């Protein structure tokens, strides 16, 4: 149990590092797009509610 718990903590720390990683210089022009990409699924969720409101929640 303690082994799996420490592995979980170790992996979560590495995952946190990945969120703060910078793109290589060759891809620096895509940085604004990459900043917006995590929000795109939220737009689809909101689109579902707008669509249902448009069809009167059938």
Swiss-Prot record:
Protein's name according to its UniProt entry: Photosystem II reaction center protein K
Membrane topology reported for the UniProt record: Single-pass membrane protein
Chief place where the protein resides: plastid
Family: Belongs to the PsbK family.
InterPro entries xrefs: PSII_PsbK (IPR003687), PSII_PsbK_sf (IPR037270)
GO biological process: photosynthesis
The organism's place on the tree of life at top rank: Eukaryota
Disulfide cross-links: none
Gene Ontology CC entries for this record: chloroplast thylakoid membrane; photosystem II reaction center
Task performed by this protein: One of the components of the core complex of photosystem II (PSII). PSII is a light-driven water:plastoquinone oxidoreductase that uses light energy to abstract electrons from H(2)O, generating O(2) and a proton gradient subsequently used for ATP formation. It consists of a core antenna complex that captures photons, and an electron transfer chain that converts photonic excitation into a charge separation.
Membrane-spanning intervals of the chain: 29-49
Source organism of the structure: Adiantum capillus-veneris (Maidenhair fern)
Subunit relationships: PSII is composed of 1 copy each of membrane proteins PsbA, PsbB, PsbC, PsbD, PsbE, PsbF, PsbH, PsbI, PsbJ, PsbK, PsbL, PsbM, PsbT, PsbX, PsbY, PsbZ, Psb30/Ycf12, at least 3 peripheral proteins of the oxygen-evolving complex and a large number of cofactors. It forms dimeric complexes.
Protein location: Plastid, Chloroplast thylakoid membrane
Key word Plastid present: yes
Classification via Pfam families: PsbK (PF02533)
Key words of the record: Chloroplast, Membrane, Photosynthesis, Photosystem II, Plastid, Reaction center, Thylakoid, Transmembrane, Transmembrane helix
Residue ranges annotated as propeptide in the record: 1-21
């Amino acid at each position: 149990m303690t082994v799996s718990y420490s592995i979980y903590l170790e992996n979560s720390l590495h995952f946190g590092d990945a969120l703060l990683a910078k793109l290589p210089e060759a891809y620096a022009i895509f940085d604004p797009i990459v900043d917006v990409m995590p929000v795109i699924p939220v737009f689809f969720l909101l689109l579902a509610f707008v669509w249902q409101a448009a069809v009167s929640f059938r």
